[in-house]
From Swiss-Prot:
Required for assembly of dynein regulatory complex (DRC) and inner dynein arm complexes, which are responsible for ciliary beat regulation, by acting as a molecular ruler that determines the 96 nanometer (nm) repeat length and arrangements of components in cilia and flagella. Together with CCDC39/FAP59 forms a 96-nm-long complex in flagella. This is Coiled-coil domain-containing protein 40 homolog. Asymmetrically dimethylated at Arg-246 and Arg-523 during flagellum resorption. Probably methylated by PRMT1. The keyword Flavoprotein does not apply. Residues 1-28, 465-500 are annotated as: Disordered. It comes from the Eukaryota. Interacts with CCDC39/FAP59. GO terms for biological process: axoneme assembly. PANTHER family: COILED-COIL DOMAIN-CONTAINING PROTEIN 40. It comes from Chlamydomonas reinhardtii. The modification Asymmetric dimethylarginine is found at R246, R523. It is found in: Cell projection, Cilium, Flagellum. Keywords: Cell projection, Cilium, Cilium biogenesis/degradation, Coiled coil, Flagellum, Methylation.
Amino acid sequence: MADPMDQPSTSDPVDNQIFGEQGGLRPDHPLLRRAQEALKVQFEANRTRLQEELREKANALKQAKARREALGVELYGFQQNLAKLQLNLETTHQNYQCEDQLNQLKQQLSLEEGDTKGERSRRVCVCVCRVCCRIDTLQDNLKGTQQQLALVSAQLEAQKRETRAALETLAEAEVGGCVRDEALSAIQDGMREQQQQELSLVLEIEGYKKDVVREQLKHESLTAVVRKVEGDAVFVQKQIEGAQERQARLQEILAKLAKSLEHTEAEGEADAVDRAITKVAAEGRAIEEEMLSALSDQTTAEKATSKTAADTQELRKRIRAEELAVVETENELAKLQVDILNTEAHNSRLGETLGLLDEELRDKGRTIEKYELEIKRRNDEIEKKTREIDILNRRRDCRGSAALDTRPLQAPPPPQVKSDLALTTPMYTPPPVPQPSVGMTVTTEKLVSDMEKALTKREIISVKGRATAAKSKSSTPAGSATASSRASPSASVASSTLTRNQLDRATTDLAKSIKDLEAGRYRPVVEDAAAVGEELGRAQDKLGRVVALLEGLRQAAPHLAGELDKVLCHVADVRA
């Protein structure tokens, strides 16, 4: 039977001082002091090393952020250079188009110069033919005059033999000649005054015509400038739309790149953290193994060792959880900072682009308003010149009708000496009365044809405009209203300019024909007085067709109602 004193006693106070309640060594036991100091030194070294690695990771993260910002700035610079190159390309393309248009205009100018030279040569030939005919007529008149001179000389010899009768006849003839000379001098004075007045009126009309042509050229140049500005506005709008589309695509690409970059950075950071965690865990496991082996060698109490190891593992788990939470928080903060920087940069670029576009649109609007005011002023001046020309035409018509009513006075010779006076004194022949000429008819027909061409061109333009509007509406429903509103003013301006140019050209041709008619350059259309009524009826029918055409043009083009009303009033005055 064993001695009870040989068995270990758990109630011994010495054992209680050495071992704890669970059978392990107490933490403040001298045997564990060296182990605890060694563990403390190892933990502090690990903590210092982890802090240094954390600083290195933070520095690497800052450097990566700086490189990313530098890449973003460089990408923005490349985008600016790309935009400048695109603008230069578009400017070069516009220059090439302008050069092509200039070459076409030069070719057209050469063709028109050839036509003008041909027309001038034809007119020179016509003038030469007229001069030749005039010379032949004068030669025939000279021969007739020489024959009359021979007859007069024979009659003079016969009259010398009849002295007494001739003296009485001569006295009566002298009295009648004085009366006729006085009447002739009065008529010649009146004709000279009338010619001077007509010459002054012709000079005034030519001055007004030159002013009208000058204003018309200015108006056409302004119209061309307005068309160019409208084309530039359409082109700028297309560029804005293209830029917006490109900006949207670039934003989508940038968003995708940002997402991919964030995903890549997150994966890289996660991989780095995983590698660091794995490395730390491996080192910790190695340290634990070394520590456990050292503890197992130094102590004999397994329970105390297992308790200390369990506490150490729990402490390490807590440290790992805290470190992971800190890393995740830093990652979230870095992502938020990157998103904030990207958003601020994008907003600043959008603000600058929007400001530039607004300024450009304001400049275009001011330029268009200035051109519209200039066009209105030019139209007012043209209307004023047209009214003045109408007044001068009416004055000239009134003076022409007054000149037709005046006839030269001639005293009838005595019946006894009628045959003698026919042989001795030359008869005064009144000037021919101007009648409707071929130039007037041709000008009227030309005016009618120009009006028909203008209506045809206007219909073609309107049909093309509607077709373009329908096409644009089918292709882009959202921008159909804007396109139609831009196309309608340009079509109306083109049709109004075309009609005004044709009206001015027809008016100029009509004034030139009237001037040639007054100068006696045209022969009468109707030489027989009986056929004047028939020709007058034809002219009335043509005038009625012109009036109907003008009425249709006024209904088809309401923006020309004011000018067409003036033309219709003038036609009504001519009819009256």
